[in-house]
């Protein structure tokens, strides 16, 4: 197990001993903050907390930084061809730009390199215990937290440490949302979730059914069009497929100009519909149903190639499956198809197995946390979740400002307790607020945010916390 050199000293040097509420021994880490996960959100949490004067212990179950972007990790959802769908300027951290000579949409290997250089530049690895998983996070007296860890895989003894605060940054794109189709267990072909997809060679020469029309599903359908003997693409509803470039610029940069000009949502929707009409035309002629929603009412699907392969007959759109048979799949329109391989690109669900779900406002039946700013839990002022957002553009800047806000909140609890109390009251009153226009009610959109609206909300919270 690789641990931080800063934490290599003995408990007697670095901690005092206490007891948990049920009598277990615990090492008290004083004012140190615990960060769970060393992906993009965890790394920026470490940086911002240390820059505000806090000690940090970060626990990472894998052997390196990068989280979802580290393809070597068994929980990483990336596959060989994964690229950003948000452009470089909107994805980079505000205080650590990506190289100017990188492409508009960097490859996942470049993203991992970027995060590794970020960790190196800010000397973050010395705060990380690698190969260590968190098994329990429990409230302790005085708004503190008892965090129990062990070596990844369950080897060795458990260890409990007490922290002044906790940042959860374990990601929300690693636990597959698995479908429950009738007869699936009887299917004699191969079936897998997109989390197990890595390389187009898995599709080569096969009859492939891709289920799901998110960005991953569209990417895999395109690769099946290139490699498989036949590809069906099943979707529950039709979507609007946005090109990656409009007027020669990445589409999110065009969108940002409209947002900066405060163009009304209805006008932006009209402009997007006009753009799609001029660029890809009416997709119903390829066999797709007309979408039952307007642009901006679902998470953006950004793919310039799917329409190309629909038009060339290499992808056949079909409705959602309703039942699996041993050698065929029955579709909602009554047709049957005979895929050899089914790939379920049905998304992911958040998991916080180490924490009582009620702490995050979930009653345990839905699995959806109820937080303010998608980060702060009512009645738990020293707990934050970083990166639990699904933005319409880049993610890293949002995690950066989330963790800046949390660091300043922790500092205010000492220097300006009245402001901190006002913040805590706002968390209780405003938990569950949304930061996007009307979107479809589905688990896919639980954490949907418009990046401009969300950044403005974070800026207002920072201003209110620090105003004189």
Q: What are the roles of these predicted feature ranges?
A:
Residues 2-9, 15-84, 97-245, 249, ...:
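Flavin (primarily FAD) cofactor-binding/catalytic cores of flavoenzymes
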Residues 90-91:
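Active-site segment of extracytoplasmic enzymes that catalyze sulfate/phosphate-ester chemistry
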Residues 425-439:
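Short, mixed-charge aromatic SLiMs
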């Amino acid at each position: 197990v690789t641990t931080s050199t800063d934490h290599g000293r003995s408990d007697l040097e670095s901690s005092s001993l206490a007891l948990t509420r049920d009598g277990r021994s615990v090492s008290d880490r004083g004012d140190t903050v615990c960060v769970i996960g060393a992906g993009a959100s965890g790394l920026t949490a470490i940086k911002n907390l240390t820059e505000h004067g806090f000690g940090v212990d970060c626990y990472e179950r894998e052997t390196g930084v990068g989280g979802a972007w580290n393809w070597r990790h068994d929980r990483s959802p990336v596959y060989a061809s994964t690229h950003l769908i948000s452009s470089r300027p909107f994805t980079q951290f505000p205080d650590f730009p990506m190289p100017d000579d990188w492409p508009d949409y960097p490859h996942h290997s470049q993203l991992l390199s970027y995060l590794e250089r970020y960790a190196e530049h800010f000397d973050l690895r010395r705060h990380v215990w690698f190969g260590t998983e968190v098994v329990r996070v429990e409230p302790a007296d005085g708004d503190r937290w008892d965090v129990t860890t062990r070596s990844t895989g369950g080897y060795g003894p458990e260890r409990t440490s007490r922290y002044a605060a906790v940042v959860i940054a374990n990601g929300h794109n690693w636990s597959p949302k698995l479908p429950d189709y009738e007869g699936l267990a009887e299917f004699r072909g191969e079936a897998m979730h997109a989390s197990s997809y890595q390389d187009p060679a898995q599709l080569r020469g096969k009859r492939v059914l891709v289920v799901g029309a998110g960005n991953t599903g569209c990417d895999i359908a395109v690769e099946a069009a290139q490699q498989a003997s036949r590809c069906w693409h099943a979707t529950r509803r039709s979507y609007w497929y946005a090109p990656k470039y409009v007027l020669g610029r990445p589409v999110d940069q065009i969108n940002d100009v409209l947002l900066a000009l405060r163009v009304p949502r209805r006008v932006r929707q009209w402009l997007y519909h006009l753009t799609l009409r001029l660029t890809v035309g009416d997709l119903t002629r390829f066999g797709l149903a007309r979408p039952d929603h307007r642009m901006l009412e679902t998470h953006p699907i950004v793919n310039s190639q799917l329409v190309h392969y629909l038009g060339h007959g290499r992808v056949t759109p079909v409705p959602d499956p309703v039942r699996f048979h041993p050698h065929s799949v029955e579709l909602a329109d009554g047709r049957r198809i005979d895929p050899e391989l089914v790939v379920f690109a049905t998304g992911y669900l958040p998991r916080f197995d180490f924490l009582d779900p009620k702490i995050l406002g979930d009653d345990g039946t839905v699995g959806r946390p109820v937080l303010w700013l998608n980060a702060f839990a009512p009645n738990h002022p020293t707990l934050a979740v970083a990166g639990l957002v699904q933005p319409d553009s880049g993610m890293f800047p949002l995690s950066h400002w989330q963790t800046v806000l949390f660091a300043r909140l922790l500092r205010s609890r000492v220097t300006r307790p009245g402001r901190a109390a006002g913040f805590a009251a706002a968390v209780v009153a405003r938990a569950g607020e949304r930061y996007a226009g009307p979107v479809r009610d589905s688990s896919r959109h639980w954490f949907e945010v418009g990046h401009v609206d969300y950044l403005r909300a974070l800026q207002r919270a920072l201003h209110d916390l620090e105003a004189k």
